[in-house]
Amino acid sequence: MKVVAVNAGFNVTLQMAYPPNDLLVELHNGLNTYGINWWHYFVPSLVNDDTPAGKLFASTLSKLSYYPRSGAHLDSHQSCSCSIGGTVDTELKVIGVENVRVTDLSAAPHPPGGNTWCTAAMIGARATDLILGKPLVANLPPEDVPVFTTS
């Protein structure tokens, strides 16, 4: 983007909004000064460093950690409202209803521990196999299991 602006005749200076450059400079100075023990300065009482440099580094770490501690959050990904065994059976069919399947993350038995997309994609892929009547790979005879080789 900067190249496009410069080529159009504009003088552009890009700078991060957070963290400010002065905090980054102080962070690097502290890392160079305190080496592998830098993390102790997150809890200044562990270090008992009353020097101006020690106080500045502890303050810098506190300021840099403020944003993730206060502003970062986990997004709420609704899931498991129609979990397998409760609302849907093992073929993702809604129990007690004909011709209805749940094929998204709401069919998960419990919330995934990581990114929800992977679990949702696997439920969707399995639903596709179920709808098309494809068996589980584990139920196929070994000679029918697709094998991909590289040449």
Swiss-Prot record:
Entry-linked InterPro entries: FAD/NAD-bd_sf, GMC_OxRdtase, GMC_OxRtase_C
Superkingdom, natural source: Viruses
Location within or outside the cell: Virion
Keywords: Virion
Any Gene Ontology CC annotation: virion component
Molecular function terms from GO: flavin adenine dinucleotide binding; oxidoreductase activity, acting on CH-OH group of donors
Pfam families referenced in this protein's UniProt entry, alphabetically: GMC_oxred_C
PANTHER family: CHOLINE DEHYDROGENASE, MITOCHONDRIAL (PTHR11552:SF147), GLUCOSE-METHANOL-CHOLINE GMC OXIDOREDUCTASE (PTHR11552)
Family: Belongs to the GMC oxidoreductase family.
Protein name: Putative truncated GMC-type inactive oxidoreductase L893
Taxonomic source organism: Acanthamoeba polyphaga mimivirus (APMV)
